């Protein structure tokens, strides 16, 4: 779609890329196309949001697994950097995304061997494997989540991740319930 319409991303606030590496869901070999990877980098750099779940932009190419590692602020260890020290493990549990989390976040199976790059805020790590991270990229923001099985609590966490990545934290309490077990739907045009 991006190749057919270079202005496609202009109407978006946040892109969500979910799935395992080298699948149609995450893009697979399409990440080798510089038009596509550059368009998404430009979108985030100029203020857009990007949320990656699982192995987002995952395709082994040019020494990386995550082709958007610089955007996400995380990379998957594949043996190329085993001898590099990785010091960024400090968690930031008070981050906006986690403020409703009253229990440990459920990442399901999650992913192994994910590490944070310098400048990334690690929100949750388990056994020195990043499960959730937030990263500024230019004027934009990216969030990495290792897995998001459906639950009311995870729905709220994902909602907060979307708002944060879109620079829309102030919209949190628009059509909002303090109880994350309740979802609020508003049909403004219908007056309901």
Enumerate the language-model features and the residues they cover.
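Structural motif
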Residues: 13-23, 51, 142-144
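Residue-level marker of intrinsically disordered, low-complexity segments enriched
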Residues: 14-16, 95, 103, 112, ...
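A short, aliphatic-rich alpha-helical micro-motif
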Residues: 9-10, 37
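A general structural motif
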Residues: 11-12, 47
